[in-house]
């Protein structure tokens, strides 16, 4: 939630190292004492010549560990012999079990050259990773490794960024250093770090390479002077801890990645409803009025959010006593809960250095970051001068739990249903070296002035309570391995990554801060700060509501964040370019980074949206997994009911989304169990079709639904690509035989979006929508059967209580259609009173041989609908012929 305050901030120390190949100047390493076993290989690596000390001191002795972990995964780790160099703590990213594989059974093979040491990873006769001809550099503050790539590779990943889904391959640098990035500019480092890339080689398969390293880094993709393609890692520290994984398809590769970083967390049923927020709701009356206006406009609103406006002078764990008084806030939350709706607020990591409970408790427990002389480390953010929680502190979880338990107490506080965490890169408005945070806060009016107090709501809100109507330190540790080498320059390392903010410490926490506990340096762990806050926040939410799935939406992420939280794509702006790029961002996070609860601020956060853009975005946003309208205080209000066409678009969007909610829930659950992505680029389902490799404006919503949005203003048509397959128009049911070519879809109203069902699919939908997901769960089901080219179709349905981390009972159905017969089988543990009331078979030109009161032909849709009354209590079979 960075605002215009930072737009004029100067870049500090923005030196950039050129593309010089230092590997040719450095001696590399020699492998000795090589030992090979059934499932592993180890070796000693010794510096092979005179140190070059390019950006630090060359380490003379390294270790090599190779593990054949499974038949599809290979672990290659190069680290210092003394294990003093920092490694990502297992408490942050638990390591996958490395036992059980063998070199003979593995699809991946490790080959090496001893002197100078280099290695290759092969799949069959194909080389996937090749470091030959470029010497390994392993220095105290700089590591470099280059791999050769095939010509014109199809590379994806290396987030977070707003560049193209398929990465550029010439003069391209991806910098990974989490930062507060207003307007999410292209070709810059953004909020998260995901050092994994996927190399898709068409019919030969897909493989991924994950570097488990949290230090700042530049990953360069370019060609040599003689045209040879390469990818090069340049990191500020850590070790080379690689995981190579392979699959026959991109989807298979994504599943393997999930096994390394952890399966995503399952979300509650209600979280897939529509959410509304805005930075700038002036008081609790305005929040209530927005809730009321949505109900009057007949636009379903599942969850209402409040930004930092609710806080007393922007201080976390406080309420503005005049604009958001506790009594009225509790009334608001009770009203929402009584109407089966939900409430979420924001919590930032930075705690105001002032007399408040969060600060006083933190100081008493010593859980804030300290400088190396033991004094409190201070920055400046929204509340003014701030302290920052140390997520490595042994007592940090207790502190965080206590703050949540007190402030969000259902009986005495604000009983939230989910949590929004922001500014957790961590952001610091005060530029480095920030020697006078008090002066900076004073000069920049932090905290900003609050709006005038309103004694009551100026307009009546029927149904709301009367109050909403108009009135007549722990000791630092220096011991332990894998913590980091001594005597490093933690502020200005010799090699400078291309951090858009300039120096490493600019607009964030100083990188020379040493954390409590093991004594990790912020220099090494900066990119983990947001994910560690995410984990602590998820734990705190579970502590206050044991057994219930906690929704936590975060801005800053690291690899594996999806196991704890969802992610919104940050402070975008109301432009068509950001509308378009949200698609590729969403696909990267959901399918490649395994963070499937994902979405962009619908209609844009910064600037002023337009009626057309917001109407189109409402339709697109309904196909994010996380669907929220949100914008900033200086922009015009953009709630969906503000414009007639946007309201109509939103109603249509939510109607389809809610009818599909169980399809969404089922596919999302599958990803949390297996890693199989729900949201997918086209090439995930058509991996041999080269025309899909660069397509980033269409996507699959599960395996069954192809979404092809209009992507520019003043347009009513879209050139949509249809692979060699059969598809059915969602609205008309008309069959479209794809031929591996573009098809122009015309006359697309601003309130519509082209949707097609992929042949071979059976989709369970609710028979009608509802105003809340609670009411939706009472609606019956309809099955839509879209036969494939071979005349068959299949699908699934998963149901549970919608909220429990470990449901007591589940319903897991499999649908198959073949030769006019529909079969339903599976696990029937979860009891529900709803039934399958109808089955619609697409692609039909004649009615079924059923009586008219049972079956009907919709010639306009080319579909036959058969009325049914199937209980979801046991297997069944229906003759649809």
From Swiss-Prot:
- Print the keywords alphabetically: Carbohydrate metabolism, Cell wall biogenesis/degradation, Glycoprotein, Glycosidase, Hydrolase, Polysaccharide degradation, Secreted, Signal
Q: Does the keyword Transcription apply?
A: no
Region (Disordered), start-end ranges: 440-485
Coiled coil location: none
Task: Provide the Gene Ontology terms for cellular component.
Answer: extracellular region
Glycoprotein recorded as keyword: yes
Q: What broad class describes the main subcellular location of this protein?
A: secreted
Q: Which domain of life is it from?
A: Eukaryota
Residues glycosylated per entry = 171, 293, 373, 506, 572, 608, 742
List the catalytic activities from the record: Hydrolysis of terminal, non-reducing (1->4)-linked alpha-D-glucose residues with release of alpha-D-glucose; Hydrolysis of terminal, non-reducing beta-D-glucosyl residues with release of beta-D-glucose
Which sites are catalytic? Answer: 422 (nucleophile), 425, 571 (proton donor)
Amino acid composition bias (Pro residues), ranges on this chain: 448-463
Q: What does this protein do?
A: Glucosidase involved in the degradation of cellulosic biomass. Has both alpha- and beta-glucosidase activity.
Q: So what family is this one in?
A: Belongs to the glycosyl hydrolase 31 family.
* Protein name stated in the entry: Probable alpha/beta-glucosidase agdC
What is the species listed in this Swiss-Prot or TrEMBL entry?
Aspergillus fumigatus (strain ATCC MYA-4609 / CBS 101355 / FGSC A1100 / Af293)
Q: What is the lineage of its organism?
A: Eukaryota, Fungi, Dikarya, Ascomycota, Pezizomycotina
Query: Which gene holds the coding sequence for this protein?
Result: agdC
């Amino acid at each position: 939630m960075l605002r215009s305050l930072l737009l004029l901030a100067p870049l500090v120390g923005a030196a950039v190292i050129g593309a010089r190949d230092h590997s040719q100047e450095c001696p590399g390493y020699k492998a000795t004492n090589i030992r090979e076993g059934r499932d592993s290989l180890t070796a000693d690596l010794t510096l092979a010549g005179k140190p070059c000390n390019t950006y630090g001191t060359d380490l003379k002795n390294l270790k090599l560990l190779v593990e054949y972990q499974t038949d599809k995964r290979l672990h290659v780790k190069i680290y210092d012999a003394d294990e003093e160099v920092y490694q990502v703590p297992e408490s942050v990213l638990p390591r996958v079990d490395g036992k059980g594989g063998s070199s003979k059974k593995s699809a991946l093979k490790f080959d090496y050259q001893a002197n100078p040491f280099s290695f290759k990873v092969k799949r069959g006769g194909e080389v996937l990773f090749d470091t030959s001809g470029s010497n390994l550099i392993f220095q105290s503050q700089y590591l470099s490794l280059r791999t050769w790539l095939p010509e014109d590779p199809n590379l994806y990943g290396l987030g977070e960024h707003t560049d193209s889904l398929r990465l550029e391959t010439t003069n391209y640098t991806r910098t990974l250093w989490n930062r507060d990035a207003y307007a999410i500019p292209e070709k810059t480092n953004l909020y998260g770090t995901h050092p994994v890339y996927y190399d898709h080689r068409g019919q030969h398969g897909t493989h991924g390479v994950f570097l488990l390293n949290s230090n700042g880094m530049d990953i360069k993709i370019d060609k040599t002077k003689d045209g040879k393609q390469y990818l090069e890692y340049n990191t500020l520290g850590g070790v080379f801890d690689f995981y190579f994984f392979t699959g026959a398809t991109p989807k298979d590769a994504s599943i393997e990645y999930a096994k390394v970083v952890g399966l995503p967390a399952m979300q509650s049923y209600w979280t897939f409803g529509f959410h509304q927020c805005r930075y700038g709701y002036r008081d609790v009356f305005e929040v209530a009025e927005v809730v009321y206006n949505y109900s009057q406009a007949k636009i379903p609103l599942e969850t209402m959010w409040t930004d930092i406006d609710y806080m007393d002078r922007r201080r976390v764990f406080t309420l503005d006593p005049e604009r958001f008084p506790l009594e009225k806030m509790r009334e608001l939350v009770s009203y929402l809960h009584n109407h089966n709706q939900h409430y979420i607020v924001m919590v930032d990591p930075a705690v105001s250095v002032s007399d408040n409970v969060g600060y006083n408790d933190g100081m008493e427990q010593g859980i804030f970051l300290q400088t190396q002389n033991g004094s409190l480390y201070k920055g400046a953010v929204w509340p003014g001068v701030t302290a920052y929680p140390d997520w490595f502190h042994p007592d940090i979880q207790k502190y965080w739990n206590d703050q949540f338990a007190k402030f969000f107490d259902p009986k005495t506080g604000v009983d939230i249903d989910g949590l929004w965490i922001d500014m957790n890169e961590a952001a610091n408005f005060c530029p480095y070296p920030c020697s006078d945070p008090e002066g900076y806060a004073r000069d920049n009016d932090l905290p900003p002035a609050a709006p005038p107090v309103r004694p009551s709501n100026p307009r009546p809100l029927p149904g709301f309570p009367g109050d909403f109507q108009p009135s007549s330190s722990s000791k630092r540790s220096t011991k332990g391995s894998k913590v980091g080498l001594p005597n490093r320059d933690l502020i200005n390392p010799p090699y400078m990554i291309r951090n858009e903010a300039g120096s490493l410490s600019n607009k964030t926490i100083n990188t020379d801060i040493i954390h409590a506990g093991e004594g990790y340096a912020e220099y090494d762990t900066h990119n983990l700060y947001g994910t560690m806050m995410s984990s602590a926040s998820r734990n705190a939410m579970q502590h206050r509501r044991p057994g219930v799935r906690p929704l936590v939406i975060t801005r800053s992420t690291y690899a594996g964040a999806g196991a704890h939280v969802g992610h919104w794509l940050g402070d975008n702006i109301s432009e068509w370019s950001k509308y378009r790029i949200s698609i590729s961002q969403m696909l990267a996070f959901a399918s490649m980074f395994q963070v499937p609860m994902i979405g962009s601020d619908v209609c844009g956060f910064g600037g002023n949206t337009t009626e057309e853009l917001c109407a189109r975005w409402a339709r697109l946003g309904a196909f994010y997994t996380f669907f929220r309208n949100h914008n900033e205080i200086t922009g015009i209000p953009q709630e969906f009911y503000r414009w007639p066409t946007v309201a109509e678009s939103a109603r249509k969007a939510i109607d389809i989304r809610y009818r599909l909610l169980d399809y969404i829930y089922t596919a999302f659950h599958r990803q949390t169990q297996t890693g199989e992505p729900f949201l997918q680029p086209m090439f995930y389902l058509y991996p041999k079709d080269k025309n899909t490799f660069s397509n980033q404006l269409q996507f699959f919503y599960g395996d069954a639904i192809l979404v092809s949005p209009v992507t520019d203003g003043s347009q009513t048509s879209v050139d949509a690509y249809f692979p060699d397959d059969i598809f059915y128009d969602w609205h008309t049911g008309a069959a479209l035989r794809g031929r591996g070519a573009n098809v122009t879809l015309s006359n697309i109203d601003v309130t519509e979006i082209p949707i097609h069902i992929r042949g071979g699919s059976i989709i369970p939908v609710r028979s009608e929508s509802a105003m809340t997901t609670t009411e939706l769960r009472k609606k019956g089901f309809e099955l839509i059967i879209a036969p494939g080219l071979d005349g068959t179709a299949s699908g699934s349905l998963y149901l549970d209580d919608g909220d429990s981390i470990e449901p007591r009972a589940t319903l897991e159905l499999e649908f198959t259609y073949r030769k006019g017969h529909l079969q339903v089988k599976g696990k029937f543990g979860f009891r529900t009173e709803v039934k399958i009331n109808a089955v619609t078979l697409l692609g039909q030109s004649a009615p079924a041989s059923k009586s008219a009161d049972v079956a009907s032909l919709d010639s306009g849709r080319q579909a036959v609908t058969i009325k049914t009354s199937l209980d979801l209590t046991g297997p069944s079979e229906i003759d649809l012929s």
